[in-house]
Amino acid sequence: MANDKDIAAVGSILVNTKQDLTTRFRALFTLRNLGGAEAVKWISEAFVDESALLKHELAYCLGQMQDESAIPTLEAVLKDTNQEPMVRHEAGEALGAIGNPKVLELLKKYAEDPVIEVAETCQLAVKRLEWLMNGGEQTKDGTDENPYCSVDPAPPAQRKSVPELRTQLLDETLPLFDRYRAMFALRNLGTEEAVLALGDGLQCSSALFRHEIGYVLGQIQHEASIPQLQAALEKMDENAMVRHECAEALGSIGKEPCVQILERYRKDQERVVKESCEVALDMLEYENSSQFQYADGLLRLQSAH
């Protein structure tokens, strides 16, 4: 069991701007896995960083940890219009993931935010909290289990055929929450047919929606999605939030063609895309080596003594 001293040692790597971004990401994931108020405190301290990629990942981790001590930090990040939209969006999503209804009024306020990605995120988070408050987690009628350890912005839709779920996914007249439910139902199926249906979502009009498609394709890690992920990454006029998520998904799939694509974009002019490629390649290097675990902040500290 890690003590506060161990956590502080890993935390000091996370907040050290002189460290490589890849090393700091490893420290972040170590803190997420360790959990607890002290880990939350260290993660919260890194929101002053210049890297939007790192800050958005901080918010994501705080949401996944579901520790209510992170709520004040996440509220402050959501309110801070100097933070990049992708960071504010992730803070809003994390508040929904933690699931405490006390943030409902704040989320309703920011559901009207002038930044569309932030507004749509908060609309989804409001719907998720209302779903939780109505006992949604207790009633799992006809839905498939989430095979991943993620807290999602929407529950899966009830089990239907892939063509039916695809229709729900792509129907832009439906509320975003309902389309997200179809997205997570398709993800939970994880078949090639489901993956190809999800890939079609990369053509939809909402950048937030497209970036979430990239995220779930990264979770599934199915090679059938490589061409669509590559096409989105190569689209230079695509929203950087979408391109970065597609880069991370390619890294998650990790096949040789993915490595070649990531190598090509590790010098991209968009900082968040460039950094995503660097982090993804670092994760792949770990997976292809004999290193025991990616979130190895504590192991690295021990080997340095």
From Swiss-Prot:
UniProtKB keywords: Hypusine biosynthesis, Iron, Metal-binding, Monooxygenase, Oxidoreductase, Repeat
Binding residues annotated for Fe cation 2, in chain numbering: H89, E90, H211
Catalytic EC class: oxidoreductase
Enzyme Commission number: 1.14.99.29
Organism annotation: Danio rerio (Zebrafish)
Gene3D superfamilies, per the entry: Leucine-rich Repeat Variant
Protein name, per record: Deoxyhypusine hydroxylase
HEAT-like PBS-type repeats: 54-80, 87-113, 178-204, 209-235, 242-268
InterPro entries to which the protein is assigned, alphabetical: ARM-like (IPR011989), ARM-type_fold (IPR016024), Deoxyhypusine_hydroxylase (IPR027517), PBS_lyase_HEAT (IPR004155)
Cofactor binding note: Binds 2 Fe(2+) ions per subunit.
GO biological process, one term: peptidyl-lysine modification to peptidyl-hypusine
MF-aspect GO terms: deoxyhypusine monooxygenase activity; iron ion binding
Reported function: Catalyzes the hydroxylation of the N(6)-(4-aminobutyl)-L-lysine intermediate produced by deoxyhypusine synthase/DHPS on a critical lysine of the eukaryotic translation initiation factor 5A/eIF-5A. This is the second step of the post-translational modification of that lysine into an unusual amino acid residue named hypusine. Hypusination is unique to mature eIF-5A factor and is essential for its function.
Reported cofactor(s): Fe(2+)
Pathway(s) this gene product operates in, as recorded in its UniProt entry: Protein modification; eIF5A hypusination
Catalysed conversion reaction: [eIF5A protein]-deoxyhypusine + AH2 + O2 = [eIF5A protein]-hypusine + A + H2O
Binding-site positions, Fe cation 1: H56, H244, E245
Disordered as annotated region, ranges: 137-160
Family: Belongs to the deoxyhypusine hydroxylase family.
